[in-house]
Amino acid sequence: MDVDIDPEQLFTEKMPKNYAQPDVLNHTFDLLSNLHKLLPNHLVEVLHSYRSEEDKNKCEKPEFSGLEKILARHQLPKEISLSPKPSLMPSWRRRIINNISGNWKKCHLWQKSTYEPPMGTIVARWTKKNLQPTEDLKSVIQRLSALGPIISVTPSGRQSAVVVFRDITSACKAVSAFQSMSGGSMFQCSWQHRFMAKNKTWSRKCTSKVHLEKRESTVGEPQELHN
C-alpha cells in the first residue's frame, strides 16, 4: 500500500493524533517509511549526468537504476522495496514466542564447552606500577619455572598469560604462592580449570600437601648432613 505524501499537509497539520488507535499508528509508520521519497538523491543525478545519449536511447526507462530495471522487468510487487509493515501480533502472543525461543539458553548442555584445559593450567596476571619492580612475560616465566616444569605458555593480552604445568603439584604451588596482588606483589595466579576453581577443598588439600612435603624435606636435610 503506497502512501501519498503531501509536504504542506505534513508540516501544517496541527490536530493531535491518538496513537493508541492502530490505524493512526500504522498510517504514521507508513508515512515515515516513505519520507525518503522527499529527499533528493544527488548521487543518482550525478550518475545520470555522465550518461551518453546512446546509453539513454538503449534504456527504456533511463531514470531507473540497474536494480530498478530488474524489478520492472520481472514485474515484482512494489512492496518489495518498501519498509516492512508494523506487526499486528498481540503482545501476549509475542511474549510466548520469545519465551519459547529463549528456552535453549536454560539448557545446561549448551553451556559446557567441548574443550577442557589440563588440570595443571593456571592464569598468570601482573600489573605495572612506577614505584614497584616491573613484571613482564619473561620474568613471569622465570618465576613460575622455579616451581616446576612448564609445558606451554600462551600470552593472553598484554599483562596476562595461560601457563600449563606438567604436574598439578606445581600449579598448586603457583596458586598458593601468588594468590593476590596484595603485600607489594604485582603478580597473581588463579586456576583456569573450572573444577579446580570451584573445588576450594581440593585446592587447599593439594596446597597443604605441598607445604607438608616441603616441611618434611627441610626437616630431613639436616639429619642427612648430621649422619
UniProtKB/Swiss-Prot annotation:
It comes from the Eukaryota. Expressed predominantly in the testis. Disruption phenotype: Deficient mice are viable and have normal fertility. This is Testis expressed protein 56. It comes from Mus musculus.
